[in-house]
């Protein structure tokens, strides 16, 4: 198995466990240049809020989207958007990525700004 297939297998197992919970899901995806976060409704049918380093307001604040500073801004922004949509508590879906580095910084930033995991 290659790295991508292994990551997708881990993500599938995680989503199977998260699917049984009746909470919205904070789904994170990272690439070498950007990081993306989405809050998906508890039934999985719609995206309630989304944020990424591709968006103009965040792109203005950071020089490069693939670092921890950018992940911190995305975490703060997604927490604010979740609060505006009336979501206080989410399940964290790291999409098979290790809870380390940019993924961890995004999660910590979202927690600091009022989102409960």
UniProtKB/Swiss-Prot annotation:
Query: Which Gene Ontology terms describe the biological processes this protein takes part in?
Result: translation
Any one GO CC term of the record:
cytosolic large ribosomal subunit
Q: Name one GO molecular function term.
A: 5S rRNA binding
Keywords recorded for this protein, A-Z: Ribonucleoprotein, Ribosomal protein, RNA-binding, rRNA-binding
The keyword Ribosomal protein appears for this protein:
yes
InterPro entries given for it? Ribosomal_uL18_bac-type, Ribosomal_uL18_bac/euk
Entry superkingdom: Bacteria
Q: Which Pfam families match?
A: Ribosomal_L18p
The record's comment on protein family reads:
Belongs to the universal ribosomal protein uL18 family.
Q: What does this protein do?
A: This is one of the proteins that bind and probably mediate the attachment of the 5S RNA into the large ribosomal subunit, where it forms part of the central protuberance.
- Outline the subunit composition: Part of the 50S ribosomal subunit; part of the 5S rRNA/L5/L18/L25 subcomplex. Contacts the 5S and 23S rRNAs.
Q: What is this protein called?
A: Large ribosomal subunit protein uL18
Give the taxonomic lineage as stored in the record: Bacteria, Pseudomonadati, Pseudomonadota, Gammaproteobacteria, Thiotrichales
